[in-house]
């Protein structure tokens, strides 16, 4: 796996565990790729301990750590070679270009923006590099005198960048005259399935939240040859659903037990996820699939989560070092706002004649029923780059 894609996958799992610790019984949904690339724009201007902390949280040292000896030695020897920063940003440039390559198979719209108080002007070199590597243009704005007007303008920009799907990213009172710099990050995805669900097969079914509580959902169903993988500890079954052209896939990790989600979340690691979803682990089955139809829209103020993961200096007025971004020494990151939207519904490919048909003898595959009627983990992966675009858990309709 590409070192940057592996860093993003590791960040996804660590970030998810941090969110889960304070969100028992709640849905979680975020974009590790989008958060990572947005933070990398800030990392580009970070120096000193601020940069070291960001590299650790973003797992940008991961390829170095993997090459050292035993676990204790890894930790002891782990060094964050900030001289590699240019290579890291070139990797982000390549990855972003590949993921956002125009296609008629799916819609992926992202909005990344850095807004700094105008009395802390950005270096020209920083502005040039952010545009080169990330295709973004940091904005100098008047938070001191017009914070609410700036908030509304940012919201309008995000709305236009995401085809009207991400609204009101910055809520009332989220910025004020003391705001120095904020990072906004929004992502919208809509894909069509390789094998579509038929709307007439969607029926109301119970989704079991726990042993005593159920809620009705619109349950989609199909019978199709799909890739399935089995997880032994804790016991769970996984399934891969391709979107059109197979550029992107949805993976579902369904615990065998109704109450098994917590154990699965605790057990999952970067290495295990790689193993479970490898081609060697996948087997084709004739699957009778039942999957809830759902929309998820989640908003996060990332300051507290990232601080608790170890990235605290960036938010500290007396410790932040963004001297690669501005000459003003007391520039710091006031907040990071992240919002994502996804819709899982019946829509599949607008099938051309012959789609889904087979020539020659039909191979008989083992049959399995995959009934997603209780809490599960899921993620959406860009297959060519092996990057996790979205990661989430669905606990309650």
UniProtKB/Swiss-Prot annotation:
Gene3D superfamilies: Alpha-1-antitrypsin, domain 1, Antithrombin, subunit I, domain 2. It comes from the Eukaryota. The record marks 362-363 as: Reactive bond. It holds the Pfam family Serpin. CDD domains: serpinB10_bomapin (cd19569). GO terms for cellular component: cytoplasm; extracellular space; nucleus. GO terms for molecular function: serine-type endopeptidase inhibitor activity. It is found in: Nucleus; Cytoplasm. Keywords: Cytoplasm, Nucleus, Protease inhibitor, Serine protease inhibitor. A motif (Nuclear localization signal) lies at residues 74-77. SMART domains: SERPIN. Belongs to the serpin family. Ov-serpin subfamily. Protease inhibitor that may play a role in the regulation of protease activities during hematopoiesis and apoptosis induced by TNF. May regulate protease activities in the cytoplasm and in the nucleus. This is Serpin B10.
């Amino acid at each position: 796996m590409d070192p940057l894609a592996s860093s993003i996958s590791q960040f996804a799992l660590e970030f998810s565990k941090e969110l889960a610790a304070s969100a028992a019984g709640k849905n979680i949904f975020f974009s590790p790729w989008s958060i990572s690339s947005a933070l990398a724009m800030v990392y580009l201007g970070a120096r000193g301990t601020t940069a070291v902390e960001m590299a650790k949280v973003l797992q940008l040292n991961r390829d170095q750590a993997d090459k050292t000896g035993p676990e204790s030695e890894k930790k002891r020897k782990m060094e964050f070679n900030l001289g590699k920063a240019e290579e890291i940003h070139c990797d982000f440039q390549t990855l972003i270009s590949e993921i956002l390559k125009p296609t008629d198979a799916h819609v992926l719209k992202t909005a990344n923006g850095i807004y700094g108080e105008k009395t802390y002007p950005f270096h020209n070199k920083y502005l040039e590099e952010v545009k080169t590597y990330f295709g973004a243009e940091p904005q100098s704005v008047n938070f001191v005198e017009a914070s609410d007007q700036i908030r509304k303008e940012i919201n309008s920009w995000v709305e236009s960048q995401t085809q009207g799907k991400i609204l009101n990213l910055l809520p009332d009172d989220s910025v004020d005259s003391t705001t120095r710099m904020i990072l906004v990050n929004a992502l919208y995805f809509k894909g069509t399935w390789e094998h579509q669900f038929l709307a007439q097969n969607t029926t109301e079914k119970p989704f079991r939240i726990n042993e005593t509580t159920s809620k009705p959902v619109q349950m989609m169903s199909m019978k199709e040859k799909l890739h399935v993988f089995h997880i032994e500890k804790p016991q769970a079954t996984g399934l891969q659903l391709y979107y059109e052209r197979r550029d992107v896939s949805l993976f579902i990790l369904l615990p065998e037990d109704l109450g098994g989600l917590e154990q699965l979340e605790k057990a999952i690691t970067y290495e295990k996820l790689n193993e479970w979803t490898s081609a060697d682990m996948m087997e084709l089955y004739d699957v009778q699939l039942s999957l809830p139809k759902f929309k998820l829209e989640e908003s996060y103020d990332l300051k507290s989560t990232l601080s608790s993961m170890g990235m605290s200096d960036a938010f500290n007025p007396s410790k932040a070092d963004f001297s690669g971004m501005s000459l003003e020494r007391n520039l710091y990151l006031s907040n990071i706002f992240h919002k994502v939207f996804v819709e899982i519904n019946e829509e599949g490919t607008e099938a051309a004649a012959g789609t889904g048909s087979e020539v020659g003898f039909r191979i008989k595959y083992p049959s399995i029923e995959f009934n997603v009627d209780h809490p599960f983990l899921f993620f959406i992966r860009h297959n060519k780059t092996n990057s996790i675009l979205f990661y989430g858990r669905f606990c309650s309709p």
